[in-house]
């Protein structure tokens, strides 16, 4: 198993657009071998003193944090999928 994780700032007003894009991308990833894709929206992200999710992505006021991950059977499948997705015109 190989897991890729992502932390993304998304303007609150763009949530529906993000979900549409993530759904489309999720289908493409699944077509190339991803076994699970999770999009988790911020509900209770605390501000840290040294670092936190907001600082990690330089989130602006009005942006929500999305923590997502993709599970692949192995790194080789993820690497091959990345190359194919870069050529996929969907």
Regions found by a protein language model. Name each.
Residues 1-67, 71-88:
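Short S/T/G/P-rich N-terminal loop/turn motif that feeds into the first structured element of a domain
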């Amino acid at each position: 198993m190989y897991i890729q994780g992502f932390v993304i700032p998304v303007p609150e007003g763009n949530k529906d657009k993000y979900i549409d894009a993530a759904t489309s991308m999720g289908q493409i990833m699944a077509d190339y071998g991803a076994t699970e894709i999770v999009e988790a929206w911020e509900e209770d992200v605390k501000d840290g003193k040294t670092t936190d999710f907001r600082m990690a992505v330089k989130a602006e006021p009005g942006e929500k944090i999305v923590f997502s991950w993709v599970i692949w059977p192995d790194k080789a499948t993820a690497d091959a999928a990345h190359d194919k997705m870069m050529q996929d015109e969907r």
